[in-house]
């Protein structure tokens, strides 16, 4: 078994899923050194299969409307949804070069209908922000 030594880093994130990648990008853009641990090898593994491989990125409803229509535990999501509302999510991916479209039910997908575009973009953005990835299991 091969082991990797992690040198000093400000932030260590366990998992390169959607939340881990977004957190890594945000922290790195704020000047922190970030290391993401991903033993599965590929980033965004589950993200790549969401929405039948199309990736339902967000819901295009206003936060309050979304909380009323969709959530059974709105208190859990409320602060996150208001901190990073659907408009901000759409703007984030538009600026990253991933155009989005809204379909019935206010579901938002990449125009390409390919979840890999979202996962690959998040990985590319993380790397360009200086995020380090460790892709093997650590002891």
Predicted feature locations:
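A conserved short coil-to-beta-strand element within the FAD-binding core of flavoproteins
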Residues: 134-139
């Amino acid at each position: 078994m091969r082991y990797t030594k992690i040198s000093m880093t400000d932030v260590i994130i366990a998992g390169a899923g959607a939340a881990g990648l977004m957190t890594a990008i945000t922290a790195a853009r704020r000047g922190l050194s970030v290391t993401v641990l991903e033993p599965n090898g590929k980033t965004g593994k589950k993200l790549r299969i969401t929405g039948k491989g199309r990736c339902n990125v967000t819901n295009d409803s206003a936060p309050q409307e979304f909380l009323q229509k969709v959530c059974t535990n709105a208190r859990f999501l409320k602060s996150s949804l208001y901190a990073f509302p659907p408009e901000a999510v759409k703007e984030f991916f538009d600026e990253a070069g991933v155009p989005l479209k809204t379909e019935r039910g206010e579901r938002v997908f990449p125009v390409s209908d390919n979840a890999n575009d979202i996962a690959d973009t998040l990985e590319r953005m993380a790397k360009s922000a200086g995020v380090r990835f460790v892709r093997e299991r650590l002891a």
